[in-house]
Amino acid sequence: MSLATNNAESKFPSLQRLPNHVAIIMDGNRRWYKKHREECGHTHTSGHYYGAKVLPNILNAVLDLGIKVLTLYTFSTENFGRPKEEIQEIFNIFYTQLDKQLPYLMENEICLRCIGDLSKLPKGIQTKINHVSRMTASFSRLELVLAVNYGGKDELVRAFKKLHVDILNKKISSDDLSESLISSYLDTSGLTDPDLLIRTGGEMRVSNFLLWQIAYTELYITDTLWPDFTPQDLFEAINVYQQRSRRGGK
C-alpha cells in the first residue's frame, strides 16, 4: 500500500510495466461538496455531478497510456442505505452520462461492461445499460467496467448459488471446484484481476470492492477527493506502481 505524494507535476509514466487493469474506488464526492457548497449552489449530493465530470479526462489518459481495463466502483450495494434523494440523483447522473457518453465510447472503441446485481436497479437504467453494452460490445481498445449495485461479498454469494445449482444439475462436480472455476462464475469472468487499485479520498480500506480479485493487487491511496482527481494524479499512481516489485505472495 502506498500513500500519494500529490505531485501535480507527475511525469507521463513509462510505457514499460504498465498495469493492464486499473481499478478505482472513486471516493470523496460528498466531502468535496461540503468544501465547495457555496460555489456549487445545488443539493447536498451535487458532488456526484462534479465527480462525473472528471471521468472523460481520466478515460483520455487511460487511452493514451494503452491500459486495457478500467474498473470503477460506481455504486455499491451499501449505497442503497443512503437518503432516497441522493440515490435518485446518482441514478439520474448515471443514466444521463450513459446516454451522453455513448458517442465518445464508440468513437474511441471502448467496450462498456457493468458488473453487480443489476436486477435491483431501476428498469430504465437496466435498459440503458443493456443498450450501451450492446452498442459497444465489439470494441476492444479499452474495456470500461462499471461496478453498479456491486458488493464483493454479494458477488461471491451469487456466484456460489450458481455453482450450487450447477452441481445439483450435474453440470459440474464438486471435485471440479478450483480457483479458476470459481472465478468463471464471478461478475468479472473473463477479465484479468486488477494490477493496481487506486482509492481517492484517503480512506484506508477496500470497502467490499473486488474482494476475490484483489488478492495480489497493488494498492495506492491518495488524499485527493474524486472531483479533484486529474490525469496527473493517475500518472503519479502508475509511477509508484512501476517502482513496486510484484511477487504475487511468493
From Swiss-Prot:
Active site: D27, N79 (proton acceptor)
Keywords associated with the record: Magnesium, Metal-binding, Transferase
Needed co-factor(s): Mg(2+)
Binding site for Mg(2+): D27, E218
Record EC number: 2.5.1.-
Protein origin, superkingdom: Bacteria
Binding site for substrate: 28-32, 48, 76-78, 80, 82, 199, 205-207
Any one GO molecular function term: ditrans,polycis-polyprenyl diphosphate synthase [(2E,6E)-farnesyl diphosphate specific] activity
Alphabetized InterPro entries for the sequence: UPP_synth-like, UPP_synth-like_CS, UPP_synth-like_sf
Cofactor: how and how many bound: Binds 2 magnesium ions per subunit.
One of the protein's GO biological processes: polyprenol biosynthetic process
A Pfam family: Prenyltransf
EC supergroup of this enzyme: transferase
Function: Catalyzes the condensation of isopentenyl diphosphate (IPP) with allylic pyrophosphates generating different type of terpenoids.
Complexes and interactors: Homodimer.
NCBIfam families: PRK14840.1, uppS
Family statement: Belongs to the UPP synthase family.
Name of the molecule in the record: Isoprenyl transferase
UniProt source species: Chlamydia pneumoniae
